[in-house]
Amino acid sequence: LRFEHQTHEPCCRQGEEYKYLRGKDSIYGDAWNFITNREGITKFWEDGLKRSGKFENVITVGMRGEADTAILGHAATLKDNIDLLRDVLNTQNSLIRKYVNEDLDSVPRMLALYKEVEPYFYGDDTTEGLIGDPQLDGVTLMLCDDNYGNLRTVPTKEMLNHKGGYGMYYHFDYHGLPISFEWFN
């Protein structure tokens, strides 16, 4: 049995793919930005679901910025990021209903709570996060490590009944700051 999953490639499309398909005259536009290039990004996801949605998948939902960055960057407010991610999830769920199965509950979906995404899930004292959002009903929430093998977060008692359940992302190797390591060579 082999299980492979692209953890941060929404709607069966890879960021590396976008890098090669983007451009001024591309049907996908030239910016990995859901605000300024909504039509192009939506088309990119749509084509991924048309191509791969008929196969057995765990479809990643959500969006990050390019190269593992925050979706709107650090200058944007927490609320701006959360509102944008809600819009992204709504768009992706609509595409999944259209091209994979109208019954979202029958489609395995996953949101990775990377360090760039985790604050949007929880929110803060003044800003409601995505926790409990209907767009995430049935979505597996993938918890992530801190690049040192420690979980960044665990479900609270109130979260244990989340319909999509939980998964875990764990680095077997990591190349980047603050340190690079490999467990296997």
Labelled PLM ranges:
Residues N37-K163:
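Gly/Pro-rich turn-and-neighbor structural signature
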Residues D145-G149, T156-N185:
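Structured mid-domain segments that build the active-site/substrate or prosthetic-cofactor binding neighborhood
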Residues S26-D30, E66-L78, F172-F184:
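Glycine- and acidic
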Residues Y20-R22, D30, E116, Y122-D124, ...:
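Intrinsically disordered, low-complexity regions enriched in small/polar residues
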Residues L1-K50:
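Hydrophobic or amphipathic alpha-helical targeting/insertion segments
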Residues E9, R13-Y20, I71, F121, ...:
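Short acidic, gly/pro-rich beta-turn/loop elements at beta-sheet edges
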Residues R2-Q6, M110, T140-M142, G167-Y169:
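Structural detector of well-ordered beta-strand residues that form the stable sheet scaffold
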